[in-house]
Amino acid sequence: MSTDYEFQGWFPFEEPINATIHHVAEVLDAPVSLDVKGNPTFRSDSLLVYSFEPKREDDRDSARTALGFDINLTLVFADYSRGEDTRMIRAVQNMIRSVISLASVPGLHAVLIEEERRDDLILLSVDDGKVTLNRKFEGWSLWPEVLAIVPEPHHFETLHILP
């Protein structure tokens, strides 16, 4: 069983799936392979990283309603550390390191969510280079070593899923 973190958003690349996976794999120094459908993916320690585009317009509409912006990609970080603290912290640090690196891409707009679209499970948002941490996400206080990955000064706000 894994804990899935989804970085959902607008990724301004000509080929979002390929460019995003290769960008993150380079950050984590991991080799990219292809899954059974021919899509790029990779594993780094206990993280499995893959991505997918919205299949139907309904999926995009749902995201637009919940997030307030259009999405063209979901980047998934599946953490298979199974609750082992050291591995889990390292996996989440690597995920945050990857997301922060993507934040520097001009025009990128996305949110990082743990498991489901709930206010308290939003970790952060990225809007054209600006990283905003969710004040309601308990992980920032529980895991100071994860927060340390985010460049200072930290900008906290209360982030919401739209009704």
Language-model features, listed with the residues they occupy:
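Charged, amphipathic alpha-helical segments and their flanking helix caps
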Residues: 5, 10-18, 76, 80-109
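Short, intrinsically disordered low-complexity segments
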Residues: 30-86
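Short, extreme N-terminal segment that most often corresponds to the first beta-strand
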Residues: 1-37, 158-163
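Acidic, proline/glycine-rich low-complexity IDRs
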Residues: 104-163
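Short, low-complexity, polar/charged sequence segments that are solvent-exposed and flexible
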Residues: 26-30, 93-94, 131-132
